[in-house]
Swiss-Prot record:
This is U3 small nucleolar RNA-associated protein 25. Keywords: Nucleus, Ribonucleoprotein, Ribosome biogenesis, rRNA processing. Belongs to the UTP25 family. Component of the ribosomal small subunit (SSU) processome composed of at least 40 protein subunits and snoRNA U3. Residues 34-74, 123-166 have a biased composition (Acidic residues). Residues 7-24 have a biased composition (Basic residues). One of its GO terms (biological process) is maturation of SSU-rRNA from tricistronic rRNA transcript (SSU-rRNA, 5.8S rRNA, LSU-rRNA). It comes from Aspergillus oryzae (strain ATCC 42149 / RIB 40) (Yellow koji mold).
Length: 724
């Protein structure tokens, strides 16, 4: 979990709901019972009874529901009169179809909603924890609206639905072809092709080895020729008139329903990528929905025919977005609504009030990636269901009535991994067909265990039927093969072993998968100082990743710390202090801090310590004492730097206990040496020293560059490398 920041108000009281009419469920031998799991526990256990997701719900989930409780009361009093008028009109013209009754929204109602939306629950535990999981069936009015939609524009869209449509080719492929591909994936038989797309970008593509040739797709510069729903064509062309940069290489694989891992995400290109993903997600929801509606109409028309229509999953949600903050969710939703252009957005004001916030003006000097991630509402505890009808997008829909789910890993896990086994539920993930993870590197800094937990529960057989019509469920769902058809898209600023594990373990798409990574020049060549800085890298031996922390600690205490202590205790000049030790892992930080506090070796060394869990008073004290020389050494975690991006003064020498994951941090931390212009030459001579092992290959490549990393890992003539 991220350190606490300024949060938007949490919690609301739940309104009463009308009774929900459900269809009888089906039973089948194909649905496996999943035994109740034990709660996994961990540092987020405190949220089991404290969801804080501000989710209260109105009555039945039809697209004519109103945000105002006053409308409901008014409707009750007016209902007998309205029903009488409707009866008279129907009698007068029995051939005319009954028109759908909609509620009008008045200014007074909006003011009432505004007052209700700012009410904060005194105790978040009073919220109904499983309210967003309650199942509701489409109302009769929605069904009528759907039939009208099929008659109105079904023919126009049908031209786009052919065998060349990636949607049809991917999800409706022949069973014998699918079986061969699934077997190849299960046997881990992949055919791979690699290509240098440009001087700064590499592509690796893999597909199940079934004997077919494999090549790379051509770049996509315009979406004009894509098989999009007619409703999306015009707004998509307006927002994405031209595709540029790396997105040209990514887009063909995204719209072809292949798994995508992109490791070169930048703030400058995030808007374009977000729009591309929004187009793809909405297009998928609309095509899935229209296919079901057209088949519904066909069943109603051909009631005596023996139709075998396989067009559904077990549950309604089809798209899952995993995002780091509420503000990131707002940006995605804005892209979605601007593309879908609904006539009505139910609960939109409440969504903006609880999810959006203004940027902190004091952060104008912060780096762009920091402002993008933490700007606005940076709360990492949320989940949201979006429901699409012909003219409406409904916010805060229950998950089983939603088409899309947007959530943070923490927000989603709190309802999946509750202490009460009866309340645990992950069936709403059973039919997810598109998973989109944006800013995956930010999720690493929160708690990657939540992400891994969610991935392990994707596309499992549901424990309950949830009103499913199993005669319409696709065969590969029933055969428990949905994970081989699911598309996963993950965007990150850089690749880590955890992210690579997702690529190899969870990206099992029968259509193939790609990994797109940059060619790094190296952060050491981009230091912000006006003078050259001595940058030294020391390699130590490590037998395995599990033994790496012990080997690193031993090398640090015997080789690095001994010389550091000598300089501090015997020095009479300016070199005796100002030593910043940057530690990537919090566990390593605790180990080093305890060693400084208890070891005889560091008995005469004064030090301060700052981590992501330090309170503000301790942080200010440690920074002040380090700047004025009272502390010779300052221990500093990479994760703290990620969340705060402070400028540390008084630094004369930097020791990297391990190279940082984020290459931007290298330049920022080296820049601390130049905070005092009068002593910049001395600080440049003190320079930077970093420890690394062969298990740090991915991190090291980003720091020293793609061309240098191989020699530094394999060099047998020495284990010290210096760059100036």
């Amino acid at each position: 979990m991220a350190p606490p920041r300024n949060r938007a108000p949490k919690g609301r009281g739940a309104r009463a709901r009308a009774p929900i009419k459900r269809r009888n469920g089906f039973t089948t031998s194909r649905v496996d019972e999943i035994e109740s799991e034990e709660p996994s526990g961990g540092e987020e256990g405190q949220f089991e009874d404290n969801l804080g997701d501000e989710m209260d719900y109105d009555g039945p989930m039809d697209d004519a529901s109103s945000d105002s409780d006053e409308d409901v009361e008014d409707d009750k009093s007016a209902r007998p009169y309205n029903e009488l008028l409707q009866l008279l009109n129907t009698t007068a013209d029995s051939k005319a179809p009954a028109r759908k009754k909609r509620k009008t929204e008045h200014k007074d109602d909006k003011r009432a909603v505004a007052q209700n939306d700012i009410v904060v629950a005194a105790n978040e535990e009073e919220l109904l924890e499983d309210d967003d999981l309650q199942q509701q069936e489409p109302s009769d009015e929605e069904d009528e609206d759907n039939l009208d939609e099929v008659d109105a524009d079904g023919q126009a869209d049908s031209d786009n639905e052919d065998d060349n449509d990636p949607f049809e080719a991917h999800f409706a492929r022949k069973e014998d072809e699918l079986s061969k591909q699934i077997k190849a994936v299960g046997d881990n038989k992949w055919k791979t092709v690699k290509k240098e797309l440009s001087e700064d970008l590499r592509l690796a593509r893999a597909a199940p080895d079934t004997g077919s040739d494999l090549s790379c797709l051509p770049a996509l510069k315009s979406i004009a020729n894509l098989k999009l729903k007619r409703k999306l064509k015009t707004p998509a062309l307006e927002r994405l008139s031209q595709i540029s940069g790396h997105a040209q290489q990514l887009a063909p694989y995204i719209f072809d329903y292949q798994d995508v891992l992109y490791g070169a995400r930048k703030s400058s290109s995030s808007t374009q990528l977000r729009d591309i993903l929004a187009v793809h997600a909405v297009n998928h929801v609309l095509k899935t929905r229209d296919r079901v509606l057209k088949n519904n109409a066909r069943v109603a028309k051909e009631q005596d025919a023996d139709l075998d229509l396989r067009d559904q999953g077990f549950t309604r949600p089809k798209v899952l977005f995993l995002l780091p903050t509420k503000q990131a969710c707002v940006r995605v939703v804005e892209s979605i609504t601007q593309l879908f252009q609904p006539e009505q957005q139910e609960n939109k004001k409440r969504f903006m009030d609880t999810f959006s916030a203004t940027d902190d003006k004091s952060w104008e000097s912060k780096p762009d990636d920091f402002q993008e991630l933490f700007g606005g509402n940076d709360d990492d505890m949320f989940r949201l269901g979006l429901k699409f009808t012909r003219k409406t997008v409904k916010f805060f829909a229950q998950f089983y009535a939603s088409d899309m789910i947007l959530a943070s890993p923490l927000g989603l896990r709190t309802i999946m991994d509750q202490a009460d086994a009866k309340k645990r539920d992950h069936d709403f993930l059973s039919s997810i067909e598109v998973v989109i993870v944006d800013q995956a590197d930010a999720l690493l800094m929160q708690n990657w265990d939540h992400v891994d937990y969610i991935f392990k529960h994707l596309n499992l057989q549901p424990r309950e039927a949830h009103g499913c019509d199993f005669s319409r469920v696709r065969t590969w769902y029933l055969d428990n093969n949905a994970r081989y058809v699911r598309q996963m898209i993950m965007l990150a600023s850089f690749i880590t072993p955890e992210i690579n594990s997702v690529f190899s373990t969870h990206m099992l798409n029968v259509s193939g998968k790609i990994k797109m990574t940059p060619v790094y020049a190296g952060a050491i060549s981009e230091t912000p100082l006006p003078v050259s800085v001595k940058q030294t890298f020391s390699r130590f031996d490590s037998l395995s990743p599990a033994k790496d922390p012990d080997a690193r600690f031993k090398h640090f205490t015997t080789t690095v710390l001994s010389s550091l202590v000598r300089n501090v205790t015997s020095g009479r000049g300016n070199n005796s202090g100002g030593i910043l030790i940057v530690i990537p892992s919090y566990l390593d930080f605790v180990r080093v801090r305890n060693y400084f506090a208890t070891s005889a070796q560091t008995m005469n060394v004064s030090f301060g310590a700052i981590s992501e869990y330090s309170d503000t008073r301790d942080i200010m004290r440690a920074r002040t004492h380090f700047m004025n020389g009272r502390h010779s050494v300052l221990l500093y975690t990479e994760r703290f730097h990620h969340f705060r991006r402070y400028q540390i003064r008084g630094v004369k020498r930097v020791i990297m206990y391990g190279v940082p994951e984020n290459p931007l941090f290298w330049g920022e931390i080296v820049g601390f040496l130049g905070m005092d212009p009068a002593a910049i030459d001395e600080a440049a001579e003190g320079g930077v020293r970093a420890l690394f092992s062969k298990w740090d290959a991915l991190k090291l490549e980003r720091i020293v560059g793609t061309k240098r990393v191989g020699n530094m890992l394999r060099e047998k003539g020495g284990d010290t490398f210096t760059f100036v």
